[in-house]
Amino acid sequence: MKITKNILKAEFIKRPNRFQAYVKINEKIEMVHVPNTGRCKEILIPGSMVILREENNENRKTRYDLIAGYKGDMLINIDSQIPNKVVHEALMNLKIDILKEYTNIKREKTFGKSRFDFKLEKENGEIYYLEVKGVTLENDGLTMFPDAPTERGTKHILELIDVKNKGMGAGVLFLIQLNGVKKFTPHHKMDKNFGEALRLAKEKGVDILAYDCLVEESSISLNNPISIEI
């Protein structure tokens, strides 16, 4: 998918809280919005190059969103709104093999006490609930989720087990917001409960999927399935 708004580069200075950061644009320091509540400490390093998206919304305090950052030569998209859009585009274009037969695609649908990112349906009425998690944490080709504890994420995984137990299809797709990685695994040291829930979900028949992305400064799209170790 193309990022149609104005894109520009900046130097990262600091991130005083989850939602705000300071960057340098043409020698001027500017506060920007960070659309990601994760830590992103391996990406948002003082002096590193980041990518901004200009919003031009008079009702906002900040003019720009910080949507990506360079880790060496590797560009990592950190916009938490992007994964659902990328996966929706991939579903519409039949790029996810095990989900190609689900032609009715609905977004943000509730089941039980959770709202899942997608409710998919085949022509014969079979239903499948899909949850999407964006992944930005990488170390030597190994990607992990989460990069901060996530009770909400664990709740989603347990609800997917309930979906499966009720005879419907269920899956979680980890969208790795970078390219050229080797493997995905849950980040047990960061959130043991999430890792245990994911392992249980796999045992109960929930599909666990991971895909990397082709990431450029002004575009991002689904790329290839990635090996998973749980």
From Swiss-Prot:
Pfam families: SfsA (PF03749), SfsA_N (PF17746). GO terms for molecular function: DNA binding. InterPro entries: SfsA, SfsA_C, SfsA_N. CDD domains: SfsA-like_bacterial. It comes from the Bacteria. Belongs to the SfsA family. HAMAP family: SfsA (MF_00095). This is Sugar fermentation stimulation protein homolog.
